From Swiss-Prot:
The chain crosses the membrane at residues 35-55. InterPro entries: Prot_translocase_SecE_dom_sf, Translocase_Sec61-g, Translocase_SecE/Sec61-g. It comes from Pyrococcus furiosus (strain ATCC 43587 / DSM 3638 / JCM 8422 / Vc1). One of its GO terms (biological process) is intracellular protein transmembrane transport. This is Protein translocase subunit SecE.
Amino acid sequence: MAELQERIRHFWKESRRAFLVTKKPNWATYKRAAKITGLGIILIGLIGMLIRIVGILILGG
């Protein structure tokens, strides 16, 4: 039981330290992250669509 409490205490300490180091992103950083995420989603969708089209053409739908 003491080991579990020590592990929880250590986790809390490390999490708190990481939280204090982080900062809220500014608007430009947020927009850049949103654009990159959106482009990634679109790219994955296009790849999936191309795989589906190739599958339909090869297997005959």
